[in-house]
Curated annotation (Swiss-Prot):
Substrate binds at residues 19-21, 45, 140, 224, 256, 268. Belongs to the metallo-dependent hydrolases superfamily. DHOase family. Class II DHOase subfamily. The lineage of its organism: Bacteria, Pseudomonadati, Pseudomonadota, Gammaproteobacteria, Enterobacterales. It comes from Buchnera aphidicola subsp. Acyrthosiphon pisum (strain APS) (Acyrthosiphon pisum symbiotic bacterium). The active site is at 252. Binds 2 Zn(2+) ions per subunit. Catalyzes the reversible cyclization of carbamoyl aspartate to dihydroorotate. This is Dihydroorotase.
Amino acid sequence: MSKFVKKIKIIKPDDWHVHLRDNEILNQVIKYTGKFYKRAVIMPNLNSPITSCLKSIAYRNRILKSMHLNYKFKPLMTCYLTNSTSPKELEFGFSKKIFVAAKFYPNGCTTNSKTGIKKISDITPVLECMEKIGMPLLIHGEEINQNIDIYDREAKFIEKTLDPLRKKFPKLKIVLEHITTKESVEYIKNNDVNYLSATITPHHLMLNRNDMFYGGIQPYLYCLPILKKNKHRMALRKAISNGDKHFFLGSDTAPHLHKNKINMLGCAGIFNAPSSLLSYVKVFEEMRALKYLQSFCSENGPKFYNMPINKETITIIKKPCKIIKKINVGRNVIIPFLSGEILNWSIESD
C-alpha cells in the first residue's frame, strides 16, 4: 500500500486476548471491545477464576447482559487451569463450545494468578487430553522465580518450560500470548504455524522500557510481561511487518481502577481497548506494512483457531481521533492507554 493511503477497508478484526473483569468494570469497558472487534477471547482470571463449565456459562451470560446495543461482539470463553482441572470437564466444555481454549497461568505471574500452575508436569493428563481433542493452550510465558531477572523471564520460560512442553506434546496447539522479546519471535517462527503461534499487544509494539520511567515512574505503563529493551520492540515490529502467519492480534487490554494502579503495590495491566486497533494501524503505517494489516488483525487468528473468517468489514480513515481521557466507574475512574492523545486514524462511522 502507498504511504499516502487515506482509507483502509479490512475484514472486521477479532481480539484474541481480552480482560473484561466483572460487575461495574465489565459494564463500563465492554463497549470499547465491541466497537472495534467481532469476536474476543475472554481471559478467565477473575477474582474467582473461571475454572468450570458452569462458571463460564454464568460469566458469559453476564457479559452478554452488559453488552452495549450498538457494539455487540461474540465472547469466546476460556478455562483457567489449576491442579484440580478435570480433563473430562475440559473435553465436555470444548465439545459443547463452552470453552474455545484453556489458559495456563504460572503461579504468581500476573493478576489473580495465585491459583495458577506451579509445575506444568502437574497437569500432564490435562495436556494429553487437550492435544488429543485439538483444544488450544493459551500461555502467559514467564518463568516465575525470584532468582530470575524480571526482564529475562520470557526467554527463560521458552528454555525451561515451553521447549520441553513442545517436545512432549508436539501436536498440542499453543498460543504464546503477549510476546515481548526477540527470543520469542525467533522461537515462534521456527515452529509449525498450525501448532504454535503468538499474540502481540499494541503497547509492546509502541513502547520500550525507557518509556515506563520517562520523567518519573509511569504506573500506567506497568504491565506483565513488562516492557523490554528497544531491540525487542523492533523484533516484534519486524515480525508483524512481513505477513508472517504465526502472529496475530491480541491486545491484552486489562482495566484496573485508578486507585489500584497508583497505590503502593500497583496492579499490572494496560487498558487499551479504546485505542488498540487504531494503535495497530499506526504501527503498520510506520513500518510501511499496511498491506499486512488485515492478515494480522483479521485472518491469522481465526485460521489458528479453526474458525471462520468474519464476513463483516470495517473502514479506517485518515482522520484524527482523540482517545477518551477517562472512564467513570461509580466513584472511581479507569485511565486508558494514550489517554487524551490524538491518533491519526479513525473508524469511518465516528
